[in-house]
Amino acid sequence: MSESVHTNTSLWSKGMKAVIVAQFLSAFGDNALLFATLALLKAQFYPEWSQPILQMVFVGAYILFAPFVGQVADSFAKGRVMMFANGLKLLGAASICFGINPFLGYTLVGVGAAAYSPAKYGILGELTTGSKLVKANGLMEASTIAAILLGSVAGGVLADWHVLVALAACALAYGGAVVANIYIPKLAAARPGQSWNLINMTRSFLNACTSLWRNGETRFSLVGTSLFWGAGVTLRFLLVLWVPVALGITDNATPTYLNAMVAIGIVVGAGAAAKLVTLETVSRCMPAGILIGVVVLIFSLQHELLPAYALLMLIGVMGGFFVVPLNALLQERGKKSVGAGNAIAVQNLGENSAMLLMLGIYSLAVMIGIPVVPIGIGFGALFALAITALWIWQRRH
């Protein structure tokens, strides 16, 4: 598999299939590991406000390595970068299994994830082009969300049975992702021979940030995806505390089932976006973004399981329809200006900065004793207002 190959632009080429399988297994491990590690924190009597800290150390790795991972993705064959990154995730999951501090192990998984993300999205533009890129993003998002669906549930269910079994399953998933990466064709590096001087790399990354921010379309995409993923991660942790308060259920599995409803909805929304939205009609996704916040607000007031399931699925549908076109827009415009790997690295910086900020505010709210239902109401209202403001700004510019 070491030879270079010409790109086969089919959506179902051998390389694309390998990317999708590797992405599924890697994302499965990510999501199962989150809920397995949360169960470990509960079992070891960590305070409730420490739960979002777990995700904050994960996204902190993204932010710390943001200036460098884009160049890594563009300087080497992206399939090999993905394999190395999944190896780091495997090491992190295994370290938690063997009793190393879960925050340290999860940080290592975050380093692997930071290296993985620019490569996994950047390779799509090398395996397919043009009008197929939105569809390729739809496949990637669908496989990711299917992994979120199954991984989240598996992590919670296995953790209710035995936490160590859940952690071992995560390590096994990462091992499978490493194997799948072997079957991704070794495409030529997008931008080989770049300087590895850390100061120059940081300066180059900041230049990429500036270039993308000055372009109205890429700035619009960066802000939209950052708000979405920041809110999405915060919602996952809100559910962990909301379920016992609103529904009176205290197991590890129920929050994962509710997260699964969001995942199912995103698959549906991503498919709809691939059919109904093009790079020229991206603004069609904006009403869906506003509705996410409105439905989160309504959801926070529920006390029955069935309405909660339905509303979370609706949130997912709106989310998939909202984020897939924005991702495709950034990849297409970014590939032409700063390179796909750098564009995704800048996107990761924005998204993870938003996650860090939102999780920090959420953790602080929990720490000072604000009830989870008012937190959810305020969270939904602020998100709807933020997307409304973004849409108004986009229409004016």
Swiss-Prot record:
<keyword id="KW-0997">Cell inner membrane</keyword>
<protein>
    <recommendedName>
        <fullName>Lysophospholipid transporter LplT</fullName>
    </recommendedName>
</protein>
<feature type="topological domain" description="Cytoplasmic">
    <location>
        <begin position="278"/>
        <end position="280"/>
    </location>
</feature>
<dbReference type="GO" id="GO:0045332">
    <property type="term" value="P:phospholipid translocation"/>
</dbReference>
<feature type="topological domain" description="Periplasmic">
    <location>
        <begin position="1"/>
        <end position="17"/>
    </location>
</feature>
<feature type="topological domain" description="Cytoplasmic">
    <location>
        <begin position="39"/>
        <end position="52"/>
    </location>
</feature>
<feature type="transmembrane region" description="Helical">
    <location>
        <begin position="367"/>
        <end position="387"/>
    </location>
</feature>
<feature type="transmembrane region" description="Helical">
    <location>
        <begin position="257"/>
        <end position="277"/>
    </location>
</feature>
<feature type="topological domain" description="Cytoplasmic">
    <location>
        <begin position="388"/>
        <end position="397"/>
    </location>
</feature>
<dbReference type="GO" id="GO:0005886">
    <property type="term" value="C:plasma membrane"/>
</dbReference>
<feature type="transmembrane region" description="Helical">
    <location>
        <begin position="281"/>
        <end position="301"/>
    </location>
</feature>
<feature type="transmembrane region" description="Helical">
    <location>
        <begin position="18"/>
        <end position="38"/>
    </location>
</feature>
<dbReference type="GO" id="GO:0051978">
    <property type="term" value="F:lysophospholipid:sodium symporter activity"/>
</dbReference>
<feature type="topological domain" description="Cytoplasmic">
    <location>
        <begin position="326"/>
        <end position="343"/>
    </location>
</feature>
<dbReference type="GO" id="GO:0006650">
    <property type="term" value="P:glycerophospholipid metabolic process"/>
</dbReference>
<keyword id="KW-0812">Transmembrane</keyword>
<feature type="topological domain" description="Periplasmic">
    <location>
        <begin position="365"/>
        <end position="366"/>
    </location>
</feature>
<feature type="transmembrane region" description="Helical">
    <location>
        <begin position="227"/>
        <end position="247"/>
    </location>
</feature>
<comment type="similarity">
    <text>Belongs to the major facilitator superfamily. LplT (TC 2.A.1.42) family.</text>
</comment>
<keyword id="KW-0472">Membrane</keyword>
<feature type="topological domain" description="Cytoplasmic">
    <location>
        <begin position="188"/>
        <end position="226"/>
    </location>
</feature>
<feature type="transmembrane region" description="Helical">
    <location>
        <begin position="91"/>
        <end position="111"/>
    </location>
</feature>
<comment type="function">
    <text>Catalyzes the facilitated diffusion of 2-acyl-glycero-3-phosphoethanolamine (2-acyl-GPE) into the cell.</text>
</comment>
<keyword id="KW-0445">Lipid transport</keyword>
<feature type="topological domain" description="Cytoplasmic">
    <location>
        <begin position="112"/>
        <end position="144"/>
    </location>
</feature>
<dbReference type="InterPro" id="IPR036259">
    <property type="entry name" value="MFS_trans_sf"/>
</dbReference>
<keyword id="KW-0813">Transport</keyword>
<dbReference type="InterPro" id="IPR011701">
    <property type="entry name" value="MFS"/>
</dbReference>
<feature type="transmembrane region" description="Helical">
    <location>
        <begin position="53"/>
        <end position="73"/>
    </location>
</feature>
<feature type="transmembrane region" description="Helical">
    <location>
        <begin position="145"/>
        <end position="165"/>
    </location>
</feature>
<feature type="topological domain" description="Periplasmic">
    <location>
        <position position="166"/>
    </location>
</feature>
<dbReference type="Pfam" id="PF07690">
    <property type="entry name" value="MFS_1"/>
</dbReference>
<keyword id="KW-1003">Cell membrane</keyword>
<feature type="topological domain" description="Periplasmic">
    <location>
        <begin position="74"/>
        <end position="90"/>
    </location>
</feature>
<keyword id="KW-1133">Transmembrane helix</keyword>
<feature type="transmembrane region" description="Helical">
    <location>
        <begin position="344"/>
        <end position="364"/>
    </location>
</feature>
<feature type="transmembrane region" description="Helical">
    <location>
        <begin position="167"/>
        <end position="187"/>
    </location>
</feature>
<feature type="topological domain" description="Periplasmic">
    <location>
        <begin position="248"/>
        <end position="256"/>
    </location>
</feature>
<feature type="topological domain" description="Periplasmic">
    <location>
        <begin position="302"/>
        <end position="304"/>
    </location>
</feature>
<feature type="transmembrane region" description="Helical">
    <location>
        <begin position="305"/>
        <end position="325"/>
    </location>
</feature>
<dbReference type="InterPro" id="IPR023727">
    <property type="entry name" value="LysoPLipid__transptr_LplT"/>
</dbReference>
